[in-house]
Amino acid sequence: MRPSDQTYNNSMNASSSVHSLSSQPPPPHLLHGHHQCIATLKGRNAYTSSLVLAGEFLVTGSSDKEIRLRSLSSLALDDETPSDDHDLVVAAGNGAVKALVSSSDNKLIISAHQDHKIRVWKMDHVSKFHQQITHLATLPTLSDRALKLLAPKSRIQVRRHKKCTWIHHVDSVSALALSTDEMLLYSVSWDRTLKVWRTTDFKCLESIANAHDDAINAIALSDDGLVYTASSDTRIRVWSRQESDSKTHSLVNTLEKHDSGVNALALTGDGMVLYSGGSDGSILVWRIEGGGRMAAVGALRGHSKSILCLDVVVELLFSGSADKTVRIWRGVGRSYYCLAVLEGHKGPVKCIAAAYDHNSSANTSNALTCLLYSGSLDCDIKVWKIFLPF
């Protein structure tokens, strides 16, 4: 079953085999946080299907194939509905831009598309408020495709009457991730494959066929090289690169506590905690226990419909849902608290990105200010400022 077939199902029987983590009210000192929507970026005829923060810019991908760059400085102005007159817009492929990632130096943007392709873009700094974006490559590249056509056994059966080389995705590319050293790009697809690309020349190094039994919806990478993939088959699989062969990954674990398809993943910075969002509205919390293996320690419940996206900033977890809300969670020891429910979208929240607000005067050793960007099927992007005491 593809994500679109089950994404918005509402089931209150959420991952019933996993106990709920503490749902008690937050400690008194955490009750003094506040949040507000500081801007709404009005959409036109397409919804935002993906977004990523890249330095001083918010990069968004839409359901009508557009990639748009907007200066974060323009969003900090006192304007609840900022103009998009100065946005940089490019269009590529057919259908939605399913996922976006940026390099650590913010010079590369990589986009995943519904037309089965991956595209690489170069960002050049023009001024404080403007960037120039250039299309560098479409994956698989022409040279890679030509070489594979000449190689024996490079063509595989993808449908009853269709063959193609193993470097091609044959369905929507649903998620992307860069390795810590940014030498490898990982892509997953509704075609159930996990592919690995070398970023120096964007050659496809490896393709794991049938990595799952259904569409793969999300991917997350830890600093130690573990690769987590999540699927509509209800499973999360863990892959590790073999030390003897940097090109080859092997399955090292399968996490099977979800009762419904898994749509989203997020890892804490130290890689010790993994969050997974299910179509039943539950968020499972996985923690590395003795022996170095992930174990489910509980579930966060509160959303009434599918979890569609997750993000982590410091100790905070942000979750976007088909119930049109974003929730903010914080873990304290082994307990978790829902600190806020952000309401205002008129459609499912499809994608989110959060970041520490370095420019806020409210940041102290006892408080944290974050900016959260949420994209919805209502075609709007909302910008939220969140102040939370520690």
Protein language model features and the residues they cover:
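WD40/WD-repeat beta-propeller blade N-cap
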Residues: H34, L41-T48, V90-V97, T141-L147, ...
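Conserved strand-to-loop turn within each blade of WD40 beta-propeller repeats
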Residues: G61-D64, A112-D115, V188-D191, T229-R235, ...
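Intrinsically disordered, low-complexity acidic/Ser/Thr/Pro-rich linker and tail segments
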Residues: M1-F57, R68, A76-L77, V126-W166, ...
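Short loop/turn segments immediately following beta-strands, especially the blade-tip
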Residues: S73-D78, K122-Q131, S240-S246, R287-G292, ...
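Loop/turn segments within WD40 beta-propeller blades
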Residues: L51-E56, V101-N106, A177-M183, I219-G225, ...
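WD40-repeat beta-propellers
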Residues: I67-S71, I118-K122, V188, L194-R198, ...
